[in-house]
């Protein structure tokens, strides 16, 4: 029997213990090492390669190999305990330590792994080059209408700014028509905050915010506002204009037989505004105008006796603006007349002569006012009626047309209602249409051959013109020529191809009273265009 000494037993016992510990360390830790190996690409920027692939068992395995065989079990336990304490101390140190000192033990690895994995979303977003804010935007429910309105305000709209300009004009829409007051207030607050951050847009928002939508400045309607016929300087500085085609430049003795005669329209002397440069005033001639042709033309302003007499129905024109209140009517009659005028959608201010007629017939009762209104509505449907155009515009429309062509327009003389412009002997002539006692005529005696309807008067004149001149025209000036009048070719405004903006204005004026145009949600330029002369 072989003898085994106590020393040999101790050595064999120590060897077995060290083998068991080594196996325990090898089997326990590779799971953590493999986990770190899988995330090598994830933590590559945070840790070095040597640290990312470091052996977690480094210190313990080396310690196990270099450990002397004679080391006791208590020494091994003490060494492991000291290694654990040292690893815990190193885990609490800041991240600025070097990679050599950053070694892991089995107890510190889960803690460090948890802290590192918390940084994974930040690393992944930076690798994909997506820039997200760490704090998400606060979400609140918004409907599509509110979003669209806000985008209209931010992108397309031009809102009142501190330095207004004509480019800021456009189609204005009230937020009150689109949203409730609470929504408006919420949008106003959001817009104010956004404007303060941008610095480009300065908004001054109230409860009701006018906003420009749809149109840009280059889309605005470009037009020229014509001067009104009543726009004169002071009374003493008023000048006169004589057109080259005016019949007053021809001197002849009118025939005394064969046909009737009616005076021409003298508004070219009283009311026209263009000053011809070739006309000079000679102080040696008492109130006479000398033209380049040498014809002496007497001015109606030379003396008060030369002014043509007023119509017996119409009072003289006042300087102040006439109020449309039907003061001549009282009670129910005034209400009936006003309601009928509004129902027929006719404004007396649309024509200078019409306004005078309305004032003059107030005392005749509501039936006369209603009858005249209906007659003027009927007149507006005729193609040969051109509305409030000047005599110069009428001459332009009658240029290069044959004799017998004519049109009817509003008179430029405030004392009369309508004028007739016609062609005769290659010239464009003008005459007034008289209105007295509810009858219309070309003569100073409307009771003889007057018509209660303007349309009937023109149609009767066209029928009479088929057999020749139905009357003759002469000027009030002595020695002026007489021209035969034939109305055979009415010049219709419907034959012209009008612009789209004109047609839009025409439709709006058909369905909107002129006194309500200022209340439309439109820019001021469009309102001015709608209130211009509509023919």
Curated annotation (Swiss-Prot):
Record GO cellular component, one term: cytoplasm
Domain SH2, first and last residues per copy: 384-491
InterPro entries: SH2, SH2_dom_sf, SOCS6_SH2, SOCS6_SOCS, SOCS_box, SOCS_box-like_dom_sf
Domain SOCS box: 486-535
Listed CDD domains: SH2_SOCS6, SOCS_SOCS6
Gene Ontology terms: biological process: cell surface receptor signaling pathway via JAK-STAT; defense response; intracellular signal transduction; negative regulation of signal transduction; negative regulation of T cell activation; proteasomal protein catabolic process; protein ubiquitination; regulation of growth
Subunit structure: Interacts with RBCK1. Interacts with phosphorylated IRS4. Interacts with PIM3. Interacts with KIT (phosphorylated).
Transmembrane feature ranges: none
Protein name per its UniProtKB record: Suppressor of cytokine signaling 6
Function: SOCS family proteins form part of a classical negative feedback system that regulates cytokine signal transduction. May be a substrate recognition component of a SCF-like ECS (Elongin BC-CUL2/5-SOCS-box protein) E3 ubiquitin-protein ligase complex which mediates the ubiquitination and subsequent proteasomal degradation of target proteins. Regulates KIT degradation by ubiquitination of the tyrosine-phosphorylated receptor.
One annotated GO molecular function: signaling adaptor activity
Domain comment (free text): The SOCS box domain mediates the interaction with the Elongin BC complex, an adapter module in different E3 ubiquitin ligase complexes.
Keywords: Growth regulation, SH2 domain, Signal transduction inhibitor, Ubl conjugation pathway
Record organism: Homo sapiens
The protein's annotated pathway: Protein modification; protein ubiquitination
Residue ranges, annotated region (Disordered): 80-105
Matching PANTHER family: PHOSPHATIDYLINOSITOL 3-KINASE REGULATORY SUBUNIT (PTHR10155), SUPPRESSOR OF CYTOKINE SIGNALING 6 (PTHR10155:SF28)
Keyword Ribonucleoprotein: no
Keyword hit for Magnesium: no
Extent of Basic residues compositional bias: 80-89
């Amino acid at each position: 029997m072989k003898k085994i000494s106590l020393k040999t037993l101790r050595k064999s016992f120590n060897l077995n213990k060290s083998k068991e510990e080594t196996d325990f360390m090898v089997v326990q830790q590779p799971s953590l090492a493999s986990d770190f190996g899988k995330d090598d690409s994830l933590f590559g920027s945070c840790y070095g390669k040597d640290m990312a692939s470091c052996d977690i068992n480094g210190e313990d395995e080396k310690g196990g190999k270099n450990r002397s065989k004679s080391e006791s079990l208590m020494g091994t336990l003490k060494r492991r305990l000291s290694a654990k304490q040292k690893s815990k101390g190193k885990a609490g140190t800041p991240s600025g330590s070097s990679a050599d000192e950053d070694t892991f033990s089995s107890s510190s690895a889960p803690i460090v792994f948890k802290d590192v994995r918390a940084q994974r979303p930040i690393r992944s977003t930076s690798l994909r080059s997506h820039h997200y804010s760490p704090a998400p935007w606060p979400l609140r429910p918004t409907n599509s209408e509110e979003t669209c309105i806000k985008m209209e305000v931010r992108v397309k709209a031009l809102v009142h700014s501190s330095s207004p300009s004509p480019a800021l004009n456009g189609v204005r829409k009230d937020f009150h028509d689109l949203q409730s007051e609470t929504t408006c207030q919420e949008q106003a607050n959001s817009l104010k905050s956004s404007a303060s951050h941008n610095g480009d847009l300065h908004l001054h928002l109230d409860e009701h915010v006018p906003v420009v939508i749809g149109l840009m400045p280059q889309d605005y309607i470009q037009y020229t506002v014509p001067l009104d016929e009543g726009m004169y300087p002071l009374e003493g500085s008023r000048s006169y204009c004589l057109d080259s085609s005016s019949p007053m430049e021809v001197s002849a003795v009118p025939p005394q037989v064969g046909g009737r005669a009616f005076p021409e329209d003298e508004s070219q002397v009283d009311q026209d505004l263009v000053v011809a440069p070739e006309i000079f005033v000679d102080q040696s001639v008492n109130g006479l105008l000398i033209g380049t042709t040498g014809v002496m033309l007497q001015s109606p302003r030379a003396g008060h006796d030369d002014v043509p007499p007023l119509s017996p129905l119409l009072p003289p024109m006042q300087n102040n603006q006439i109020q449309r209140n039907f003061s001549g009517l009282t009670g129910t009659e005034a209400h009936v007349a006003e309601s009928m005028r509004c129902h027929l959608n006719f404004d007396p201010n649309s024509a200078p002569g019409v306004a005078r007629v309305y004032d003059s017939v107030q005392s005749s009762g509501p039936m006369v006012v209603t009858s005249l209104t209906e007659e003027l509505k009927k007149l507006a449907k005729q193609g040969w009626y051109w509305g409030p155009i000047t005599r110069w515009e009428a001459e332009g429309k009658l240029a290069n047309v044959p004799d017998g062509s004519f049109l009817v327009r509003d008179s430029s003389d405030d004392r009369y209602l309508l004028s007739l412009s016609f062609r005769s002997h290659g010239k464009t002539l003008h005459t007034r249409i008289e209105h007295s006692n509810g009858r219309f005529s070309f003569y100073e005696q409307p009771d003889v051959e007057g018509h209660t309807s303007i349309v009937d008067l023109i149609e009767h004149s066209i029928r009479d013109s088929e057999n020749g001149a139905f009357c003759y025209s002469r000027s009030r000036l002595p020695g002026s020529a007489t021209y035969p009048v034939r109305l055979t070719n009415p010049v219709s405004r419907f034959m012209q191809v009008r612009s789209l903006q004109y047609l839009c204005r025409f439709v709006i004026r058909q369905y909107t009273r002129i006194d309500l145009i200022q209340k439309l949600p439109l820019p001021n330029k469009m309102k001015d265009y709608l209130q211009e002369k509509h023919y």
